[in-house]
Structures are given as C-alpha cells and as structure tokens.
Design a protein with these regions (language model features):
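A detector for short, charged/polar N-terminal pre-domain segments
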Residues: 3-9
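A structural motif detector for beta-strand N-caps
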Residues: 10, 14-18, 22, 28, ...
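Short, intrinsically disordered, charge-balanced linker/junction segments flanking boundaries
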Residues: 65-69
Length: 69
C-alpha cells in the first residue's frame, strides 16, 4: 500500500511490483523494474528513500533515514 504523510507522497514509476502488504510511506521514489516484497516497510518521513531501477527490497525489510542522510 502507498501512504501519503502530510505533504510527502510516494512516487511510483508504475512499472514495478509491490506486495499487497508492503507499506510505502511518505517521500519514497520507486524506479521501474523495482520490487518491494512482503511485509517490507519504506518510511520516508524525514528524508527521501530512492529505490533505483531493477532494485528489490526483500521480505520483512524496514528502511528509514535520519536527517541529512
């Protein structure tokens, strides 16, 4: 699922695969041919998370950033 967080919205190329129970939150960019697997959480509430072309985030992964990273 994709979730906005205040003024931060996920950006999706539309040419990728996201598991139905994955959470893409806030300032997250997904490039084409990327995949986000089951129970993964990508939380872009502080800084951007950029998932490049052809990348995959495996089952149960949690991605979050600190300020300035």
């Amino acid at each position: 699922m994709f979730y906005d967080l205040k003024d931060k919205k996920p950006k999706n190329s539309g040419e990728n695969w996201v598991a139905p129970n994955a959470a893409i939150i806030g300032d997250v960019t997904l490039q084409k041919n990327s995949s986000i697997w089951f129970n993964a959480v990508l939380r872009g509430d502080i800084e951007n998370i950029y998932i490049g072309e052809g990348s995959n985030i495996q089952d149960g992964s949690v991605l979050h950033t600190d300020p300035g990273c």
